[in-house]
Each structure stands twice: as C-alpha cells, then as structure tokens.
Amino acid sequence: SAMCNDLANVVISRHGTDRQKERFLRPFVEKPLLASFCLTEPGAGSDNSLMTSFLAPRDDGSYVLNGSKCFITNASYASQFTVLCKIGKPSSSFMACVVVPAESVVAADLPDVGYATREIQLSTGGRIVIGKPEDKLGQRLSNTAGVTFEDVIVEPDQIIGNRRYGFKYIMDVLDFARPMVAAIGLGLAKRALDLTMAYTRERKQFGSRICDLPVARDTLTAMWKKVELAELSLWKACWKIQKNDKDAGIFASLAKNTCAEAALFCASEGLHLHGGYGFTAEYEISKLARDAHIIDIYEGVREVQNMIIGREIV
C-alpha cells in the first residue's frame, strides 16, 4: 500500500505544476491517506495500447472520463486515483495522465469493506465504482479491486503535463517503481533464507543437521548467492536513478528481474527444505512462497523487463 501511494503520487511530483502539487500532494503530507495508481485494464495488461478507458472533451472545456481498471491496489480505501487513459476515443494513440480526487478520508476511518463494493458519488459529477476486493493467492493483506469511472468530470488542471504525453510520464515513473518492487522481492528472499537457515540448523535427519547434508548445503549456498546478487543489482539501480543516468531504466528492470528471481527461488527452495512442514500454514515459509509469485508479475512481467533491457543494450 505504501509503495502504491508513492507510485500514484510521484508522477505528480515529477511532472505536475506547483499548483497541482499543492492541491494533490499536500493532503497526503497532512493525513495518512491512500492513493491508487490505475493502469491495468481487463483487456490491457502488459500491452497498454489495448486500453479502452478514455477522456472525451466537453463543450465547456472540461472532459469526461469513462472506463474500467483492474487489479488496483488500495482501491477500496483510496482518497485519490491517478489514471492513465486514452484521449478523445478508445482507439486514440495518445494517452493522458489524470488525477481524480475522491474522498479525503483516512483509511482507518473507513469501515472494513471485507468483500463489499464501494461507490463514490463525486460532487463535480460522475461516480467511481470500486468492485469486490480480489481473493488473491498471496499478499492477501494488500487490498486489490477493480475500479470503474462512470462519466467522471475532469477539469484541465487535473491533467498532468501535456495531455498527449501521459504514457511517457507513466513509463518514467515505473523506473522508480521497479526498484521498490525489487526491494520487496529482496526482503522476501532474505526472510526465506533466514527462516530456512534456522530450520535446517535445528532439524536433524540421517544423524546430522539438515544444513550439514551436502545436497541441502548446496541449496542454501545457491539461495545465499541469489540474495547477494539481487541486493547488488538493487543498490546499483538506486544509484543510477539518484544520478538520473540515462540508462537507469535498464538497471531498474535488471533489479526487478533479479530480485523477483531471488524471491521465487528462495521461497520455493526454502519450502522444499522445510519438507512437509513447509506446506502447512503454521510455517511462515508457506506464506512467502505464495507472496513471491506476484513479484515476478506486477510492475512488468520478467519478459517485459527483458524486452526493455534487450532494446537498450542492442
């Protein structure tokens, strides 16, 4: 949830005007509010060109937003939505980045939605309908739901930067988001390694600690190597981004892939070394194994990261 807040708001801090920063970011400084970043659609995952959400101009100079997004983090509790949408019509080649304020309500003050929907009638016109939260395999404490914008009125000052450059702005933001996802993966991989080391040091089989058995030691060594390499890749990506290097994007993709791979490997092999106990909910390693898979998917699947890297190095 914290990462998604940053993802939804960093595009405003990087590409918004001073007036937009004051209007859309100040509430998040003053209160512990949640924001949602609305990119993925039911028919548009990795290929954003297939999205159909669109912003149509009105005679008075304002716009009307219609469309549906899916797999949106914080959706059920969000006070503000950052949305990428087409301009003019669903088939347009241009995209805008739009900020839609909803309800300035601290998430803790909202009732626990459980598996209920949420509907927000906007005072400016139109409504936002948040669907039933997804029942996910992992990261179950993170709220995820679909969001539908129905005839939502958007004023020109809610559009970030040039209305045709929304896709460019979002791609820029994802260079910041991918190291954050990588950090989640690295933390998960480290936790899986620590749990597995502790378990295999304590449990004995064939007259020896499991960690002393050659096959187990090889696996633990491989896990450690994955973690260390992932951490190095993440440090370099952050360093590149801080320096604003032109090739920062490929190192963000490298860190995302490397840390996701470490998370998947360490969680899977860690569960394996726990034996049957690892397959029970009583042991934390089972939760890590469920949580690890999404790290390889969101903010760009590994194949997309490889495409980004391959395009730049060639």
Q: Which residue stretches match the model-derived regions?
A:
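Short Gly/Pro-enriched turn/cap motifs at secondary-structure boundaries
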Residues: G43-S46, F71-N74, K86-K89, K136-N143
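A short core secondary-structure module
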Residues: S62, N66-V129
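Conserved hydrophobic/aromatic beta-strand scaffold that supports enzyme active sites
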Residues: S36, T52-F54, Q80-L84, C97-V99, ...
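Long, acidic (Asp/Glu-rich), low-complexity accessory segments flanking structured domains
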Residues: E150-K168
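A short, Trp-centered hydrophobic/proline-enriched beta-strand micro-motif
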Residues: K31-L39
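Short beta-alpha junctions and helix-cap segments that line functional grooves
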Residues: F24, L50-M51, S68-C70, K132-D135
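Active-site-adjacent elements of ketosynthase-type condensing enzymes
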Residues: G43-T52, L122
